[in-house]
Amino acid sequence: MDAEKNLDFKVDIRDIDLSALPINDDTVDLDGYANAHGTLTGTLSKPFFHGDVSSKSIMINGEELTDIQCKLDSDGGIKNHLLGSFKQAPKGVLSAELDYNHEQKLLQGNIVAIYGNVRSILKMAKADYNVDGLAQGEIAINPHGSGSGIFVDVWVDDISINDLKYEEMKFKGHLQDKVWYFDDVKLMETKDVTDKGIVAVGGKVDLANGKLELEAGAVDANPALVTAFMSDPVEVTGDLNMFVQLHGTLKDPEGNGSVEVKNGSVAGIGFDDFTAMLSLANDNLKIEQAMLNKDIYKASAYGDVPLDLFRSKEQRRDPNAQMNVQLNLDNARLGILQVISPMVEWGVGETQGQVKLAGTLEEPLVYGAVKIPDGSLKFKHVQTVIENIHTDIEFEGNKVALKDISAKLGKGSFKGSGTYALRSNEREAYQLDLVADNAEIASDIFTGRINGNLTVTPQRFIVRPEAGSAPPPGKGPRFSYRPLLK
């Protein structure tokens, strides 16, 4: 340093403690050690650093970046120019060219990512979501000067959202004045296929005022998207076509939509077609009209499902929230039992009555009554068809009570009553108490004629693999249940 206080130093600083820097605050937790090598010029009151900054590893909000190599020109005020690259597990490479004006609090520049770890990047931004994928693209920060915003144009490969997988996602959007604009956002189940397996989102979210205006559509997509953010999602399959509009606030959104699922299933129970018209207001999802079809059978529904039921129990605003959905079975016919129970192979005959769905999605309850004036039913593992069925069915929450059953079984008949549990272990799933009169039955475990009193309950048995087939996965024998007569 000369008499004019001009600086001309060579700088070689090792193991700079990044956690001690004044940039640490509530949004950024910086940790690790860096080395600086270069020159310090300028004056004592306005020093200027030119050189290299490097580190083997740094942590940003608990997420690691490695092999940091940067060139830095900085006066600590108006001019701060950074050109650098760094790596991110498992195989990400990111580069950045940034300018920061400390006096104007203005950050400008570009960040380019190749195979960037999406989950890790989100955590760096203190957004901890169950989202995975590898991102490639560019982020431009204030490219047209102060306030022009952040522009994102990236593709994400092998993306999963709450374990729901897509091959590719396109995200093109920008943030301006604390408003996120979704310019072109698409999720694609199959790469380069643009006419099916697509979910698209457009609109904006005002982060400052907590408002949103969004539209979302799906074409032959995986319907598991609908349940992806449930705390305990049920298994849903089929082809989803959907259009949804949302507006209002982030806390209490409003909107409407239409949903169709073709050739689908819920928890392994199949249907041909499901359609619904929905509306959302006051933290409640209203089913304006819904129709479920299976072969020639139909069931319709309407009612209310509080959004609390899609949240974990700890996050529910109303811990006592329950759904209230009316289900009309007058046109369902007996074949609809295939949708309700996997034990039923097929059924024919009229059904008369209505039931109400209550409870939660995890523990649904059913109330109401259905009458079967004359029908036929075929159970799995039982070869004999039950004909001329007459019964009154009462739904009592988790229990289905079969009152005054009478039916023809072979050349004989039976009458009696029974119960069926909607949720229970298989050992206690059902019990039928019957009086048989020359009833003929052929099943996997019994074939013959029955007279007298009998009880039908589930029996556990070992599932033995067929000759030449591979053994079942896992250790030990695999068990299943079938009807036991006693």
Specify the residue positions occupied by each region the protein language model found.
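Membrane-proximal interfacial segments on either side of biological membranes
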Residues: M1-K87, L94-M188, D195-A401, I405-G412, ...
